[in-house]
Amino acid sequence: YLTLMGMLRGENEYTYPPYNAKQATELITCLREMAPYVIIDCGSYIANDILSAIALMESDAVLRLVNCDLKSISYLSSQLPLLRDNKWDADKQYKIASNIKPNEASEHVEQVLGSVTFKLPYSAELAAQSLAGDLLADLSLRESRGFRKAIEAISREVFGC
């Protein structure tokens, strides 16, 4: 089974009252009791996002995805001093060069991150599904094979399946 939780169309971070670290911790604890695996898509601005900060601290594993474009690499460079703090436990972080397009060099990400654990290639099929709001559809095109294989490798490493 797959359960998704998120905001409805038209909602944003100001739709609901603010919450604190204790409430974020309680939410994650409750989710862990309900499901064997909990995946939280954290925001990139963790200094002001309590849920993302708590999720990063409480997690068993962190997948840190970074696109190979200049904007993503520059932003990550500015956040690395914060992410290297001991409270974020760098040993449980998997570094992933993500959405690698043929004309982009993942080596630039590796210069900033150090070695990456996985590389996720760009998939036009996935991009089309994202635009259509159909992210749960199968990726069936041949050009998506590299993406599927990378996701399988990540699943084996992180979830043991």
Protein language model features and the residues they cover:
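P-loop NTP-binding core
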Residues: Y1-P18, A61, C68-K71, P81-Q93, ...
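Loop/turn-to-beta-strand initiation segments
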Residues: L2-T3, E33-I40, A61
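P-loop/Walker-type NTP enzyme "switch/lid" segment
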Residues: Y1-E33, A128-L131
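A short acidic, amphipathic alpha-helical/loop segment
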Residues: I50-A55, I73, S78-Q79, S106-V109
